[in-house]
Amino acid sequence: SWNLRFITGTKKTRQKAGIILGTGKYIPKLIKIQITYKTESSTANIGQVINFVKLPFCELSLTGLIRFLPQKRILAFDFTYLKISVWGLTLYQGYIQNGVEREKLFAEKELKDQAFFKYFLIKDNFIAARGKGGGLALWTREK
C-alpha cells in the first residue's frame, strides 16, 4: 500500500480547482489517502486497485481494475466500485457509471481511452508518476 503525499494538476486543472489545489498540495499524515494494487501471478499485468480516503469521521473507497505495461512504466486504471461510510455507517456501496460492463471491457480498451499513471520514479519506499492529464502524484510506502 502507498500513501499519497503530494499532488499537482495541470494548469487547466489548477484553474478549475482554484485556491484548493493551487500549484500543488502536500497531503499531511492526518489525512490518509492510500492506494493498494493487487495482482495474481497468472494475470500479472491485470489486477485490482483500491483507492482509499480516510478522515476521522468518514471513509471513501474506489475500487477498479488495473493493467500494467512494464516496458512503458504505465499503469492504466478504471474505478468502477464506490463505498462511502460516515461514522461507520455505510451510506452507499455499489458499482458506479455502468461499472460491471466497464470491468468486462477493461482489458480490451486502448490505452488512449483509459486513465493512467506513467511512473518516472520507482523506489522501495517512494513512487512518483504523472497522470494522463499531466498532473503529478508522489506516494510513500505504508509502514
Language model feature labels by segment:
Residues 1-143:
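Soluble ligand-binding/transfer domains with enclosed cavities or grooves
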